[in-house]
Structure formats: C-alpha cells, structure tokens
Amino acid sequence: MESRAAVDDAALGREAWSVLDANSTGAATVPAPGLYPHQWNWDSTFVAIGLARWDTRRAGTELLSLLAGQWHTGMVPHIVFQPAREEVYFPGPAVWRSTEHRAAPHGVCTSGLTQPPLQALALWWVWRHAADRDTAVALVRRIYPMLVAQHDYLATSRDLGGGGLAAIVHPWESGMDDSPVWDAPLEALPPVRHAYRREEPSPWHPDSHHDRYMALVLGYRDSGYDPAYLRDEHPFAVEDPMFNGIWLASCQALVELAPVAGADAGPHREAVERIRAALLDRLWADGVFRARDLRAGRLSSIRTVGSFGPLLDQGLPADKIAELVGTLESASFMGAAGYPVPSCEIRAPQFDRSCYWRGPSWVNTNWLLRRAAAVHGLVGLVRVLGSQTLRLVRQAGFRECFDPFDGSGRGSRDFSWSAALTLDLLADTVEC
C-alpha cells in the first residue's frame, strides 16, 4: 500500500493550493494533469465550492468559465474544451461537432452532454461564505439567469419519463461514469464496434462498455442534439437519484439566491416540491432511492453512493432520512469500510475496490454526503465524514479516488476536486 509521511493542516492546505495552481489555466481548473486536459463540469464546480471560503473572485471565475460553454437551450455541457489542447483528449471537438449546432455557444467548443446541476448550490456556497460581499452579490446577479435557464432546460428537455425528474442520456452525465447501475441499460443496447483511441484499456475502467458509450454519443450528435430524439428514440434514459438529488438541492439554493438577484423565489419553491414528490414516487424502493431505467421500465437492484443523493433535500421526510442513514452507516457501506464512503455496496457482486465508481471512495461524494448530514443536523456523521476524508488525503495525497479498505490512492494524482474540497474541509466547521 502506498502511503506518505503525515502532514499537519497547514502543510496539507499549502499542498492543496499548489495542486490547484498547477492545474489552473487562468480562468478554469482542469481535473488533473495529463489524462484530463480540459474543463469538466462538476469537477470545476467542486473546485468553486472548495475555493468559496478562501477566494471569492477565483471561485466566481471558475463558475463563469464553465458557464461560458452554456448552450442557448440552457444546457451546461459536461466538457468545455481548451483550444490549445483540443485533440489531446478523445472524444474531442471533432467528435462532438458542437460548433455546427446553432444552439451551441459561439467560439467555444463543448461536448453535447451535461452533468449534475451542482452550479446553483456552488453559487450559494460562494455567496454564503464570501468575505467580499459586494463581489458575491454581483456574481449572484450575473449568474442567476444562467442557472434559471439551466433548470428550465432540465425541466423541459430532460423530463423524458414525464414524471417530473430529469433523465440522463449517457453514463457520463451522471459524473459516476462506470457505476454498475449503468450495466443493464448499456447491455440492452445492440452490439456495436467503434474505434476507441486508447490502445491499452485503463485498469481503472471496465472496458467492455466503451463502444456503447461512443454509440450513444454519435446517435445523439447525429440527431442534431434533438430533444425529440432523446424522448422518442435514444436507447439510454435513466432517472438517477444523485443527479436529481443535486438538482433539488440546487433548486433550494435558488430559493435563497433569487432575492439577492431581485427575482421571485416562488418558482424555485414549486420546483423543490415537484422534484421531491417525484423522487419519492418514482425512485424510492426498499429503503433507498434507486435509479429508474426508463427504457426497461424498472428500478435498479443495485445500491450505490448515488442512492443517497436525495439526502441533500432539507425537506426529506424524517422516516426516509432514518432509513437512508441506517443503510449508509451499515456494513453495506460505511460500516465495513475503513475509508468511507464506497461508491458501490460492498456486498454487491459488482463491487470492485479498484474500479472507478464500482467500489472506491471519492472526496466529492464524501463532501456531498457530509453536506447532506449537515442539512439534517447529524453532527456525528458530519464529523466522521470530514475526518475520514481528510485522513484519506493526508495518507495518500490528492488522488482521484481511494481504496475503501486500505485508503490507498487510485487513478490520477494531483486531482483538483480532492485538493479543493480539502480546503473546504480544513475550515472544520460543522454547519447544521
């Protein structure tokens, strides 16, 4: 097992800043050197969250650089490409062809997919913690209309099931790319073969689905990124509890931000109620939230870290909170992992301690669950998740993810959201 000498909080903070400075392009922060040379949606948003207590302007610049890629439909893309390195990553701009679409932003190359709509929660976090209040208020007023457009897009173009939830149309949109939850929807696709640039498959990813990933990309692209195609023909459509839990939390953030922007909070309150009711009606089963495969018409049998996303809801019924926390703290998740929270139920046959989103623990989902615990006044759980996450990065550095049993690092080194969220955790504030 790889480990390093213990570091104190001050040294850990300096290391985190060094990672973020090294990964900065000036306006944006790439996830990690080498493998991820562009700006990823929720990576960049977590960076803004981590910067919020320390540098209001830089956090705002991070969000604005991502939103420069927003489409006229309101969709915020999952990748904004850096012009100097467009062909370094596959699939790059030549595959997505966003510049050929009239709804895409002018002069910016992006993907055609989105990721969890965390931006409103991040903006609220920046506004809440800003030392520079004038800058924070100006930022809210500038970004708020963009977030309203984003949420309108999700409510209209992505309610593919007609029940009030947003559907993802590709595993990449979940942010949890290789989760076993996507296995069944992917395996239902017809066999397909596309040339994949990687000569040697990554040991961290299951390689069997990459051709299907590309088939989904090309089908959506060739439709002209048509929302009617997504509704009627696209073969992958899943209502994910983490995606929708984040959407609900961002709607709650917009309730707080609307008055700052001089807007009416009423529509956001209505959205909160609508999404909450839909989550409980459509995704709750056997004590947890489960992803719904819209094409197969069934719920996933697999419990993952995504099952706990709706815990971010301040208004979740008390009995559901108790059941979710009981499962989270059980031997299926935190109770049997020395370094929580594993991304897949430990007892599931699909669990793999080394494979992305099929077992390893992640700083970003730990942060989200810590935030969820704080929302519900679960001080003990807040402290455990905070201390155990800092233990991971102290021991293994700012890795992409971590073995849930021994804490060893997995994936990329010098990973930006791991560094940024460490800065937030080092503030050591239990916010309930």
State each model region's role:
Residues 236-275, 355, 360-381:
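Long, repeat-rich segments with strong aromatic
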Residues 50, 122-125, 129, 250-253, ...:
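Core register positions within helices of long alpha-helical scaffolds
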Residues 2-39, 66-106, 164-239, 274-360, ...:
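Extended glycan-interaction surfaces of carbohydrate-active proteins
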Residues 44, 48, 116, 120-123, ...:
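TPR repeat positional signature
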Residues 44-74, 306-316, 366-379, 386-389:
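Alpha-helical support elements that line or immediately flank enzyme active sites
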Residues 8-16, 55-68, 133-155, 250, ...:
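Extended, well-ordered alpha-helical scaffold segments
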